[in-house]
Amino acid sequence: MTHTVPQNMKAAVMHNTREIKIETLPVPDINHDEVLIKVMAVGICGSDLHYYTNGRIGNYVVEKPFILGHECAGEIAAVGSSVDQFKVGDRVAVEPGVTCGRCEACKEGRYNLCPDVQFLATPPVDGAFVQYIKMRQDFVFLIPDSLSYEEAALIEPFSVGIHAAARTKLQPGSTIAIMGMGPVGLMAVAAAKAFGAGTIIVTDLEPLRLEAAKKMGATHIINIREQDALEEIKTITNDRGVDVAWETAGNPAALQSALASVRRGGKLAIVGLPSQNEIPLNVPFIADNEIDIYGIFRYANTYPKGIEFLASGIVDTKHLVTDQYSLEQTQDAMERALQFKNECLKVMVYPNR
C-alpha cells in the first residue's frame, strides 16, 4: 500500500485560553526510528479542557501557540529507515508519551515516571489535533480490523484503569468502588470488569454517566445527589466495605469518601488529580486499618492488554462516543465537552475527515 504524504497539513492551534485557530503547518519529518501517522481520531480529555480554559496544569504552562489532544489513533503514512515493526497502511493506536529508556524508572519498567518523557499535548510538546504526527515506533501498536479508530483512541484513558488495576492487584471476584464517572472513570469501570471484579460500585452526580457506567459493567450505581454513598456502600457490602476503591475525579470529598469505603486491609488508589496540593485524610483510619494507598500516574505497559481486552469483546466502548467533530470544528468540540458534561460522554475529533 502506498500513501502520498503532503508537504503541509492542517492543525488546530490554541492561541489563548478558549481560542483555537485552524492553521497550515509543515508535515513533520521523521527520524530513522519513527513513523508518520495520519491521525484519524482524537478524543478530548479532561487535561485538554484544563489547558484550554486555564492555560496551565500545575507547573506545565502554555507559553506559545499550542496544539492539544493526546488520545489518538490513525494509519501509518511513512516509516523511518530502521523501522521494522510497521508498514505504510497499518492501523495503529498511539501511546502518547515517549520516554528516554535510560533512566532508573525506565530500566525498572516504570517508564511512566521518566523525568524526561515527551508527552503529547503537555507543554511544550504539541499534541494530536493535527492531520499528521510522528512517533517513535516503540510507542505505536497495531490494532485489529475489528477495532474502530475511536475505540483505539480510547485505549489511552482505558490504560489508566488498567494501570490502577495492576497497581492495586485487583483480583477476580473483588468488590470495588469507583468514584467519578467522567471518561477516565468510565474506562476504569471497563478495566475493573476486564480484570474480573465481582461487584463494581460507582458514584457520580449525572444520570447519563451513571447509566453509561451500567453499560460498561457497573453492578451498582449511586447518584450522590440523592443518596449517601457511604451508607449505600455499607448496605451493598453488608458493612464490610470494599476491597479496593479508586477515586478518579480529583474531588477532595470523593477521595475522603473512597477512603472511608475501604474495608480493613483494603486498598485505595488516587487516580484523579485534585486542583489543590493538600487534602485532609483520616490518618488514624489509614493506620488502624492498614489501608494501602497507591498513587496512579498515567500508565506503563498497558497498551497490548488494552487492545486485547477491547478486541475480545470483554468490554464495549462504542456507546461512549456521543459527539463527533471535524478538525475545523475543534473549538466547538472543546466548548461542547466543557459546557455540556451532562449531555455528552466522549467527544471525538477527526483530523482527516
UniProtKB/Swiss-Prot annotation:
It is an enzyme of class 1 (oxidoreductase). Pfam families: ADH_N, ADH_zinc_N. GO terms for molecular function: D-xylulose reductase activity; L-iditol 2-dehydrogenase (NAD+) activity; zinc ion binding. Its EC number is 1.1.1.-, 1.1.1.14, 1.1.1.9. SMART domains: PKS_ER. Substrate binds at Y51, E156, R298, Y299. Keywords: Metal-binding, NAD, Oxidoreductase, Zinc. Its cofactor is Zn(2+). Homotetramer. PANTHER family: SORBITOL DEHYDROGENASE. Belongs to the zinc-containing alcohol dehydrogenase family. Polyol dehydrogenase that catalyzes the NAD(+)-dependent oxidation of various sugar alcohols. Is mostly active with D-sorbitol (D-glucitol), xylitol and L-iditol as substrates, leading to the C2-oxidized products D-fructose, D-xylulose and L-sorbose, respectively. This is Sorbitol dehydrogenase. It comes from Bacillus subtilis (strain 168). The gene is gutB.
